[in-house]
């Protein structure tokens, strides 16, 4: 909250008090202040004066905008503040907007707060006195790190609250009260809009240190099945313990998801990167089998892209994200295999060229390693200069690594970043263009793309522009001669 908004809020509260009312900061802003978290959105609730009187007050402070007439909600032009009158709500249909609203400035603090979801969000702070009104024990629940619903009936009127409970658990590291888990388990999430589901999932993926807790919480509630059925299918799906000592595909996915959160700030698209971590092994649902007494999932990286696309069609509405996922899942196994084999520059160039986000591909490969130590990612935007930049030996997971294994892992990571530098250097050099070919008599045609692709392969192989042009011209003439 900036100083200008703070001044406006205090002026509003003073004018309301002069008229016999009281203005409170409510909801998440009060919770975040108590938790010493940054306050993003400020909501004000004005008690004890009518809507007409409130509008008159707001007109003296600026230009009031009534954007929620049915809810008695206002804002002031140029300010990030929502101002509302107290209200009660009653479910009147299956849609998330199907509520009967009754605005009542004199309803009282406790009844006004009853419509809120959790005790920690039912706090009010008197703007002038600083006094906290806590009708449902929210401050104690914050101290005890508990997410607890307020009213059984009203809580169950909005099924989205099951997802909100999971989202708060992942972001705050709180536990959801058993009674709240129980009531969430009985909610029907099928009529929720995909946009609302994605909104809660996105908060968990982008704002949590442990985004896995969002999905673990939904699992405890028994609420994965409709919106996240692919994730539910990972539970109990066995993996080869030689390569995945951590357990089933669900456990592996949750571990990768939490590791990916460390790389989130450096990823080219943080949200897409986190969705990659979430969906990367969906292909194991259809490919896992026993072969000669061992568990394998051959080709899961290929089939996984299609399954992930169906998942994204259900819960995600970004074409760029779908493009990212459909490219990265088929490629996600390549870095670790290539690093293990110390493959040629030509091969690493092809890998990075195929990837929509080469840096992210390396970050993800690090996350996807079983038995991986905790990572210090502060310096991962460049090839590391020192091994300790990538491994934190104080991590409990790092105890699973021997000294030799740690060294090999450091070397593999450095190998990939070194090769990425080589690839970028190669891509910065002069190369054969379509204009170069046209200038030398190779006119555009149906096969022009094939000819340019040949030139690009030479570029990836490190062939100089001069030599690549000669070879491409020769290839083009032979190709067209054969076609004729």
Feature map (PLM): residue ranges:
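Catalytic cores of the polymerase beta-like nucleotidyltransferase superfamily
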Residues: 1-484
């Amino acid at each position: 909250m900036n100083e200008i908004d703070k001044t406006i809020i205090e002026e509003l509260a003073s004018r309301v008090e002069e008229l016999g009312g009281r203005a409170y900061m409510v909801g998440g802003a009060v919770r975040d202040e108590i938790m010493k978290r940054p306050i993003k959105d400020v909501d004000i609730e004005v008690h004890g004066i009518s809507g007409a009187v409130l509008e008159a007050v707001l007109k003296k402070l600026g230009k009031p905008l009534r954007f929620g007439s049915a809810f008695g909600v206002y804002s002031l032009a140029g300010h990030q503040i929502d101002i509302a009158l107290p209200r009660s709500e009653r479910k009147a249909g299956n849609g998330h907007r199907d509520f009967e609203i009754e605005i009542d400035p004199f309803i009282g603090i406790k009844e006004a707060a009853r419509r809120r979801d959790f005790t920690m969000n039912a706090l009010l702070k008197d703007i002038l006195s600083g006094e906290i009104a806590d009708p449902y024990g929210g401050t104690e629940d914050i101290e005890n790190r508990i997410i607890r619903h307020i009213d059984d009936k009203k809580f169950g009127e909005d099924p989205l609250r099951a997802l909100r409970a999971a989202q708060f658990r992942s972001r705050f590291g709180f536990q959801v009260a058993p009674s709240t888990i129980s009531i969430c388990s009985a909610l029907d999430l099928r009529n929720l809009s995909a946009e609302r589901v994605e909104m809660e999932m996105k908060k968990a993926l982008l704002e949590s240190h442990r985004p896995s807790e969002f999905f673990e919480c939904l699992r405890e509630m028994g609420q994965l099945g409709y919106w996240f059925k692919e994730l539910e299918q990972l539970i109990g799906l066995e993996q080869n313990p030689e390569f995945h000592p951590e357990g089933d595909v669900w456990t592996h996915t949750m571990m990768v998801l939490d590791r990916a959160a460390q790389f989130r700030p450096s990823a080219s698209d943080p949200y897409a990167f986190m969705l990659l971590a979430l969906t990367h092994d969906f292909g194991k649902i259809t490919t896992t089998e026993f072969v000669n007494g061992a568990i394998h999932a051959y080709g899961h990286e290929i089939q996984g892209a299609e399954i992930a696309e169906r998942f994204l069609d259900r819960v995600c509405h970004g074409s760029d994200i779908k493009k990212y996922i459909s490219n990265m899942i088929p490629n996600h196994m390549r870095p670790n295999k290539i690093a293990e084999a110390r493959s040629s520059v030509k091969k690493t160039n092809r890998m990075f060229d195929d990837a929509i986000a080469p840096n992210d591909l390396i970050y993800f490969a690090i996350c996807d390693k079983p038995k991986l130590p905790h990572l210090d990612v502060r310096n991962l935007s460049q090839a590391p200069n020192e091994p300790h930049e990538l491994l934190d030996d104080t991590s409990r997971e790092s105890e699973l690594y021997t000294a030799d294994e740690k060294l090999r892992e450091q070397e593999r990571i450095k190998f990939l970043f070194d090769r990425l530098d080589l690839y970028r250097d190669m891509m910065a050099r002069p190369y054969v263009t379509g204009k170069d070919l046209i200038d030398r008599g190779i006119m555009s045609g149906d096969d022009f793309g094939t000819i340019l692709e040949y030139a690009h392969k030479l570029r990836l192989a490190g062939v100089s522009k001069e030599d690549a042009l000669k070879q491409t011209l020769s290839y083009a003439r032979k190709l067209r001669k054969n076609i004729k």
